[in-house]
Amino acid sequence: MKIEVSEGRYLVDSEILNGIVLVILFTCVISSMITERSAQIITLRDKDIPVEEDKNGDDERILIPVKYPEYADRLVNLAILMRNAKLNRELIGLNVVYDDDHMRANQEKGRRLLEHVTQYAAAADVKMQTQVRIAANIANGIKHAFKEFSASEILIGMHMHKDVSAKFWGEFHQSLFNGLNRQIIMCRLMQPLNTLRRIQVVVPSRAQFEQGFYRWLERLSRVAGYLECRIQFHGRADTLALISEYVRNRHPDVRADYAEMTHWNGLPRLAETIADDHLFVVVTARKGTVSYKSAQEGLSDEIKRHFSGKNLLIIFPDQFGDAMDEMTFAQPQHTEENSAYDVISTWIRKQVK
């Protein structure tokens, strides 16, 4: 590349090379964004009528990873409200233990915790299948158990122990919902469920085109029915119309309200209406799926800023698409996701230095 066109001047110098690299990087990012957008358009075009929940074969098997005794009962209680009582299927309790020097002691703690939640569920005439699992990677352990038990969804507590990790998603939650394309419900319950007075649900646009639309809607409708509390859905008019039709036909006794919310920028205003005895539910989406939007990247910041201390469910529904590659034992518990803007900005800063 060091071809001199004159003394001290080269045909291709470092500035030209840097420019070429920047153009290649830019075109790669733009092409991936266009491909993703085109895939969403094709999906919407081919799915004029949403696929309804399979009425002939419900695959419901709820997996509940538990770790903290003070929180396990509320997770099991919520799972009991969400389950289909007519199927009378067992709940699955899971405790994952690190493969370290404290493994044996933690195994025994896990067994005692699972025995407790089994007795708690039995008091409501619900059976539980349990397992204490040893793993070097918590997310990997949950994913493997999910497949072994042929589970349909995961109900898990949100990260609340700042002494373990200061990150909003904790050590492994983000790896979990990125690595599974099945329904994952993350819970933060600050009070007993039977004291809740209202459920408020935020639904993204195009959520009706996702594979798991009717699954999460059915779960929330059951909870509202059992608690006999009012449930209010916030979203686009076309999405609310389908929700209204489903609730009216399948759960006519549920008291449901509907409020139009055209953009996720309305979350701060909605926060003013969320009381301490409300359950705030956010239906979100994974990157690359039909209902995903860039505004959802800041979901964790929005929740910390406006919904701190509130009862909360974050739902990642069943969604089309392949999950990320299987994690290995060497993979870290938590993997960060960076936007294209962050990647380009980081590269430019390095070049300037």
What are the roles of these predicted feature ranges?
Residues 301-308:
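Substrate-engagement module of ASCE P-loop NTPases
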Residues 214, 299-301:
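Terminal export/targeting leaders at protein ends
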Residues 26-45, 176-192:
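Short, structured interface segments
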Residues 293:
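An acidic/histidine-cluster motif and surrounding catalytic segment
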Residues 316-319, 323-353:
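C-terminal functional extensions of proteins
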Residues 53-274, 280-289, 308, 316-317:
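Structured cytosolic domains appended to multi-pass membrane proteins
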Residues 39-57:
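Membrane-proximal cytosolic interface modules of multi-pass membrane proteins
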Residues 1-38:
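Structural signal for the N-terminal portions of transmembrane helices
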